[in-house]
Amino acid sequence: MARPPLDQVRTIGIISHIDAGKTTVSERILFYTGETHKMGEVHDGEAVMDWMPQEQERGITITSTATVCTWRNHRLNLVDTPGHIDFTIEVERSLRVLDGAVTIFSAVEGVQPQSESVWRQADRYGVPRICFINKMDRVGADLRGTLRQMEEKLKARPVLLQLPVGEETGFRGVIDLLAEELITFADGDQGRTVSRGPVPADLLDAAREGRDAVAEAAADFDDAILADLLEGKDITAARLRGALRLGVLACRIFPVLLGSALRNKGIQPLLDAVVDFLPSPLDVPPAKGKRPGSETVDELPCDPGGPFCALAFKVQSEDGRKLTYLRVYSGTIKAGGAVWNSSRGCFEKLARLFRMHAHKREQIEEAAAGDIVAAAGLKEVLTGDTLCDPAHRIVLEGLAVPEPVVSLAVEARGVDDRDKLLPALEKLQWEDPTFRVHEDEETGQTILTGMGELHLEVVVDRLQREFGVGVKTGRPQVVYRETITRAVERREIFRAEHEGKVQGGEVLLQLSPLPRGAGVRVNVPDAAELGIGKELRDAVADSIGRACSAGARTGYPLTDLEVRVAAIPVEPGVTTDAGVRAAAGRGLMLAARDAGPTLLEPVMNLEIVIPADYAGKVLGSVQQKRGRIEGISSQGDTETIRASVPLAEMFGYMTELRSATKGRGTYTMEFSHYDRAPIEVLRRFGLEA
């Protein structure tokens, strides 16, 4: 595939709630662009983009997958992402490097909880989006209701570019409001043949009204269109597209298209919209980064002739080696070239470069600005690292990584498994920043922590399948947080003799509680203000951060407190980096123990969808779980319950809900916040109520 001009490149992702149809849309895109010659189906376990055995068995996407295809002479770098909240890091790291996104909504379920989550993630990164309302052929499809939910729940401004032709199972095509044409999709050739014709007479009034609404939205971004509207002049589709594109790039409007991916309807117009409305690498702001050891911010325009710079947004373990996914923001690099890893402070070699097609590789000789590629040979790299030209060193902003909330104890089944367990876990940690491993100091058990039960279930399954490691597991446990309830001050002095020489350190720490959700703030004045060297100052800051991660009483990380270093007295000939590290770490732990330590538990936002007949039974169950009902809504014979519930009460809830609703209830949940743990939990850890 020849390299197209940058204005003919679209680097996009497919994002949505689980089961809205992301992977089915992706499979149709690959089919209609000629990349595949057979439609892969999720329900048959044959989707190209869902290549992991765990994905094929469960019918869900677990890991983000990249591929490349072509439409209207434009290269589409396409990333399919998971919809389950347990794998939110895959969405996070994809959105970090995407220029645009297609958000899929189900016409039946509307805007679901994970739809809201991925929308917020895209907002945070400023990713322009178009929307595809899928499953228009399903009984209960509600276009107007979905648009209303987009406005109310997402605070978005949807601009409907199509009208449906036929309702529910009678859905057969769409009216293109820009071109003022009927679009239908042939049933006999899997939707390959797209026919355009005049708008049916009975839909002319609705089409004119819909086009007027589109023109009014476009007028907000083009004064000439506004003037023509006021004068009653006709406005061409090309002018409307140009104005709408400005609104999309500014993330102020979100064009909406319609279809049924499973029934092969609506995908080709969606591809046209990707080309027409979503940005090229030249349309997005330049990548920004800081020079190492400096606060100076540099901008990197997307220029193949500029200094090389790329972000490692994903690391995958393959046959014990790292395969690293890169988004190239500037410059060009050839296979075999050396780069500087600004995040690790070392040189790395890009031994080989690949263009990925799901899990299949196409070896390439070079990568340039605007590309998403995979590289073999990088040894030290981790997710979020910056790779750059050694002569132009820069550190790009990394990824926002959520904290894991569920833990699981594992132990090897046999002696052979014991030798393989930790190396296998290390490789899985390469891939997933939300997956953590540590050893329980009291029991010696290996503890896995992750984003949820399914997350850790998949990890254990991969240990057995991919690495041949047999493990026994305990019950999932909540990952609590420690915090303090009152302010304290502590002076800590450390002294030790090493090889006949006294080494020591002294710090004065002030701890104070912060509001819920504030995290940890470590306030260490500048070295000059403290009257010490920068090395000592940095040693104290690092030691305090590590001590906060280790906790004070229970081993759970500290949060929602401020640590201020008031003084670091220096005794010539005695004070050392190691000494002040020891004083700071021990001082923090002992100060927190004196500050009224308590535990916080994770609270989840829960959404339950059930037949109305079971609402009373399920509501009672939620309240018994210390849940707080946030709202109840009805749609036909279905009730949707929104509640906040402590995670500790939710283990095994799917089985309980299925039993209570005879298999007809479903639920989704995502992390909301931490709140005070109940008295029985505090007592279990020997803390005061």
Swiss-Prot record:
Location in the cell: Cytoplasm
Alphabetical UniProt keywords: Cytoplasm, Elongation factor, GTP-binding, Nucleotide-binding, Protein biosynthesis
Protein biosynthesis is among the record's keywords: yes
Primary location group: cytoplasm
Taxonomic superkingdom: Bacteria
Keyword Cytoplasm listed: yes
Example GO biological process: ribosome disassembly
Binding annotation for GTP: 16-23, 80-84, 134-137
SUPFAM superfamilies hit by this protein: EF-G C-terminal domain-like (SSF54980), P-loop containing nucleoside triphosphate hydrolases (SSF52540), Ribosomal protein S5 domain 2-like (SSF54211), Translation proteins (SSF50447)
GO cellular component, one term: cytoplasm
Matching InterPro entries: EFG_II, EFG_III, EFG_III/V, EFG_V, EFG_V-like, EFTu-like_2, G_TR_CS, P-loop_NTPase
Transmembrane segments: none
MF terms (GO), sorted A to Z: GTP binding; GTPase activity; translation elongation factor activity
PROSITE patterns with a match to the protein in the record: G_TR_1, G_TR_2
Domain tr-type G stretches: 7-282
Family annotation (CDD domains): EF-G, EFG_III, EFG_like_IV, EFG_mtEFG_C, EFG_mtEFG_II
NCBIfam families per UniProt: EF-G (TIGR00484), PRK12740.1-5 (NF009381), small_GTP (TIGR00231)
Function, as annotated: Catalyzes the GTP-dependent ribosomal translocation step during translation elongation. During this step, the ribosome changes from the pre-translocational (PRE) to the post-translocational (POST) state as the newly formed A-site-bound peptidyl-tRNA and P-site-bound deacylated tRNA move to the P and E sites, respectively. Catalyzes the coordinated movement of the two tRNA molecules, the mRNA and conformational changes in the ribosome.
Stated family: Belongs to the TRAFAC class translation factor GTPase superfamily. Classic translation factor GTPase family. EF-G/EF-2 subfamily.
Protein name, as recorded: Elongation factor G 1
This protein's encoding gene: fusA1
